[in-house]
A protein has these predicted regions:
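Juxta-kinase regulatory segment immediately upstream of eukaryotic protein kinase catalytic domains
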Residues: 1-20
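Protein kinase glycine-rich loop
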Residues: 21-25
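Active-site acidic catalytic loop and adjacent metal/ATP-binding pocket
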Residues: 27-38, 42-43, 75-77, 174-222
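A conserved alpha-helical element in kinase catalytic cores
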Residues: 44-85, 100-115
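Short pocket-lining segment of the protein kinase catalytic domain that shapes the ATP-binding cleft
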Residues: 88-96
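A cross-family kinase active-site recognition segment
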Residues: 100-164, 187
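ATP/Mg2+ or Mg2+-diphosphate-binding catalytic cores
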Residues: 142, 149-155, 164, 269-300
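Active-site activation/catalytic loop segments of kinase-like enzymes and analogous catalytic loops
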Residues: 220-248, 263-281, 290, 294
Length: 300
């Protein structure tokens, strides 16, 4: 256990029997399993850019779902701040992700994503947009704190070829979204990362959903993109079918937006790599090239 975690536990007046690191991503989130008297909880450390307003939004989403019977990592105490980083004790979510998924498991995840979106439907009317976020189809990056212009300028200084490619990809992505009228896409509160590793199952049944760090108002095509359904078509098909069965099918515009929004998602992934390089000076050029290659824009 690190000094930082020990200090946070003191702030929370916790004396656990056991502390185990689950995940600790530099410049990102961290999670530690806390066991006390046979009961489990998870101490979450939020990324350096998290603000009280940002966390309040995420916790409101979690509270809404928990009230509706979903097993999610909702807070079981107030957040505390140590050396500029926010921490919060949250509910432990049991089960394990199904990785790798079988076709049947992919279909199951698609149905569960549809059910989650149905549970969140209408919540945006009360919460509005998450502070600092916007729909993916409205900008290069869904996170408004990312300075795309500065990112591309610095990338160009490091790799002129990749900088030129990034600019071209941004132009082509904007054009593709404009061509289908993406500005008219309806938005709703989404999970924001319903990939297989964030969905827990136990004994063949859904046990819970974790990691709502990217939850915000966005389009359902973006939810499909960031759920990585491009490599799990069974998930997308089951998602469509469950929504249609529940009376909330994807519209023609949403169907038309799936491909260009996926390409916008890939550009956003590249933008995060650029942002990391801008902040640290460490550029993973291979990762940047890989993301740009998936935007549908060929290298210039």
């Amino acid at each position: 256990m690190t000094d930082a975690i020990a200090s946070v536990l003191d702030l929370l007046s916790l004396r656990p029997d056991r502390v185990a690191r689950l995940k600790d991503v530099p410049w990102g989130n961290g999670n530690w399993l806390i066991e006390t008297g046979g009961r489990r909880a998870v101490l979450r450390r939020y990324h350096p850019g998290a603000t009280p307003e940002d966390l309040a939004y995420e916790h409101a989403v979690l509270g809404h779902l928990a009230s509706a019977g979903w097993v999610v990592p909702h807070p079981i105490g107030d957040p505390v701040c140590r050396e500029g980083l926010w921490y919060c004790l949250t509910r432990y979510v049991p089960g394990q992700p199904a990785t790798p998924e079988s076709p049947a498991q992919r279909r199951r995840r698609g149905r569960d994503l549809a059910r989650l979106n149905l549970a969140l439907r209408g919540l945006g009317q009360r919460l509005g947009q998450r502070p600092g976020w916007r729909p993916q189809h409205s900008a290069v990056a869904a996170y408004a704190g990312l300075d795309w212009g500065a990112c591309v300028r610095q990338l160009t200084a490091v790799s002129p070829a990749l900088g030129s490619w990034a600019r071209a990809a941004a132009d082509q992505t904007r054009a593709a979204l404009a061509a289908i009228g993406a500005s008219q896409l309806p938005i709703t509160v989404i999970h924001g990362d319903f990939a297989e590793w964030n969905v827990h199952y136990r004994n063949g049944r859904l046990a819970g959903v974790i990691d709502f760090g990217l939850a915000h108002q966005d389009s359902r095509p973006y939810e499909l993109a960031i759920a990585r359904t491009y490599r799990a078509p069974e998930t997308a098909d089951a998602y469509r079918a469950e929504l249609a069965r529940s009376g909330w099918p994807l519209s023609e515009l949403e169907e038309a937006a799936i491909r260009p929004v996926y390409q916008a998602f890939r550009l956003d992934m590249a933008a995060w790599e650029l942002d990391h390089g801008l902040k640290t000076g460490d550029y993973d050029l291979t990762a940047i090239e890989r993301q740009l290659s998936r935007t549908g824009t060929p290298p210039p």
